[in-house]
Amino acid sequence: SLSGEIPTDKMTYRTNPSTGDKVSILGYGCMRLPTIEKEGEEGGDEIDQEMVNRQVDYALAHGLNYFDTSPAYCKGRSERAMGIALSRHPRKSYFIATKLSNFAPATWSREASLAMYRNSMKELQVDYIDYMLLHGVGMGDGMKEFNARYMDNGLLDFLLEERKAGRIRNLGFSYHGDIKVFDYLLSRHDEYQWDFVQIQLNYLDWRHAKEINERNTNAEYLYDELAKRKIPAVIMEPLLGGRLSKVHDHVVARLKQREPERSVASWAFRFAGTFPDVLTVLSGMTYMEHLEDNLHTYCPLQPLTDEEMTFLFDTADLMMQYPTVPCNDCKLSLIHI
């Protein structure tokens, strides 16, 4: 990655049109926080709170202000760890995003889902949530599961009321899977007024998502549907589960020839950040070096030129000719992101 100090005052920000929030283009994904092994316990690792605190402090000091967690992350321990780290800072200095991650049928009842929502506030040590998401709509069996999780139990109505009361400042959803659910929720935008939507977007998924996994939808369609309605997009999987930082040698050579000083990953982060209706790009930064490299990329962001965009789309086409791309065994599919 680029050598030299990372400036603390050069972060690129995007403005959320519904609240005026100035959100850093780099968002901190809290799904894989650093851990330490606990001695003598089977599979017993615990979150390295000291390291989480250090990385959060470093991120905030360099202008990053958006943190994305969920009750489902880190075996259910991510929210607590983020609450501990962030509550050491003024509440107005960060935006916290969490989700109603009621995937298990046991959590579909109104009581269980409300308990999950209230527990998030408690773990995060906050009395309002900046960005609240319906988590992974389109997963499982599509509309049927969506209705069971959010409609039949009155949960969506409840969350809309919470937004009115100010306990939720922005309400949105993250989408994976059945496109019917995505299209349905956007068709109700006049009624629900989504403040943001979280989608998987990267230069491979832009036009090849369906080829990689037929359950997915090309990012070009998802982004365009949001941009048409001026709904800010939050980006997940900018590296496609790490695959865009671990590419074939010939792709590495191709990227390095263009930008010898920049990391392979930085191309993917610049790609995601170049789109004007993107509010923030989430990166799961387990290690300080991930954080530093991404801060280099986004302090400030140098958007891709049209010519560089074409170069990346050609790179994606090239990558699709190599059938070894598909799975990096990141286990994401097993934990309902």
Model-derived features: positions:
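CE4/NodB-like, metal-dependent polysaccharide N-deacetylase domain
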Residues: 112-133, 161-165
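Conserved small/polar residues in nucleotide/adenosyl-binding loops
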Residues: 335-337
